[in-house]
Amino acid sequence: MLVKTTHFGEINIKDEDIIEFSEGIVGFEDIHRYGIIRNQNSDSPFSWLQAVEKSELAFAVVDPFVIKKDYDFVLSDEYVKALDINDPSQVNVYAIVVVPDDLTKISMNLKAPVIVNKDNRKAAQVILDTDEYTVRHYIMDELQKQEV
């Protein structure tokens, strides 16, 4: 699918990289279809969620397990059913990233991960019922903890 974007120009997104949120993303509930744009550098854990219907809307995302090795949560039966998940291997998890001017404050939202069923491309942003994670988990702080 050819998609016009503000950030990347006109790009071709493969059908298998188009995902659909039945309820949208928090704050953008009216936007349902996004393309996953993977970083050309295959070693990078970062990707983009580009709205198909709105050229200027794109979210930086990251595989949270790459940054926070002990990230763990249980997906509620409601979401397992809504996304038609039968096996954990069907799932990709992304955390939306905020990139401020001060790059030392780059953060990811671990409180509300994006869950994607790779097989049927259904997606949902799930707000976890826990105080263990926040919407601003600082990536640089996490990486420094791992170096110690």
From Swiss-Prot:
Annotated coiled-coil segments of the chain: none
Disulfide-bond pairs as recorded: none
Cell compartments where the protein resides: Cytoplasm
Pfam families on file: FliW
GO CC terms, sorted: cytoplasm
GO biological process: bacterial-type flagellum assembly; regulation of translation
Keyword Chaperone tagged: yes
The UniProt record lists the keyword tRNA processing: no
Alphabetically ordered keywords of this record: Bacterial flagellum biogenesis, Chaperone, Cytoplasm, Translation regulation
First-listed, main subcellular location of the protein, grouped into a coarse class: cytoplasm
Entry similarity comment: Belongs to the FliW family.
HAMAP family per record: FliW
Function, as annotated: Acts as an anti-CsrA protein, binds CsrA and prevents it from repressing translation of its target genes, one of which is flagellin. Binds to flagellin and participates in the assembly of the flagellum.
Subunit and interaction comment: Interacts with translational regulator CsrA and flagellin(s).
Official protein name in the record: Flagellar assembly factor FliW
Gene field: fliW
